[in-house]
Amino acid sequence: VDGGRYAILGPSGCGKSTMLNIMSGIVKPSEGRLLFDGVDVTEETTSDRNIAQVFQFPVIYGTMTVYDNLAFPLVCRGYDKAFIQSKVNEVAEALSLEGLLSQSARKLTADQKQLISLGRGLVRDNVAAILMDEPLTVIDPDLKFRLRRKLKEINQKYQSTLIYVTHDQNEAMTFAENIIVMDEGEIVQVGSPAELFDRPKTTFVGYFIGAPAMNLFECNVVDAHTIKFGSAKISTETDLKSVKDGNLKLGIRSEYVQLTK
């Protein structure tokens, strides 16, 4: 855990949520091992992993106040009242919930309820990472950008590792420092938003990242740094010595096309 912001991105049904649930311990992998900082935690219980999880739909205690919701993890661990009050007030201020602490949690808006779910992870000093499974699904579109910005502010303030699952490339590209792209249960590429956009390693990533998608064309290798596309020859910095002719495609982003007279 390094305090970074990560996104797991892919189409519906590709295994994103399953991977997240394996990380948290809700699901046990059928094979393989799970390592955190090189330590095998495959057999560790959910509570022993020191992971907080924010689900697609807000999980709150509707009969409690906002304050009691945020305090609940600390109360369960036996912290004294003075520490709990200090920590809850600190987190509530960071999440802009300080004016709502005495209100019933069930009366809040969907975005406020989701912030409570996030806050319950932040009040704990021992949380190694906060896992978020499509946390903005129930949030109005005009609030999504504001909440993503709030999440980035929280990451910078607390240096908490945030892992964000989404099928929305815009959410992933504007939130994460590094993105794990999945397709059909496999990780197909890991990289920064710029790396995924400019240098996709598979046709799937080329099509999936970007709006519009990358234009892909069949091409042939001429030599180590030249390809042939139709009647044109194009030089590239990429070393093509190990590339087989039949596996090569030329990718062009429309954003980089310039027309000259």
State what each model feature region is:
Residues 24:
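Helix-to-loop junction immediately C-terminal to a conserved catalytic motif
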Residues 6-7, 53:
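Short beta-strand immediately N-terminal to the Walker A/P-loop
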Residues 32-40:
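Conserved ABC transporter NBD signature motif
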Residues 27-28, 35, 75, 156:
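A position-specific signal in ABC ATPase nucleotide-binding domains
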Residues 9-11:
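The feature captures the beta-strand-to-loop junction immediately N-terminal to the Walker
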Residues 226, 230-261:
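Glycine/charge-rich catalytic "coupling/switch" loops of P-loop NTPases
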Residues 50, 60, 64-202:
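ABC ATPase nucleotide-binding domains
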Residues 17-20, 116-118:
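ABC ATPase nucleotide-binding domain helices that frame the ATP-binding cleft
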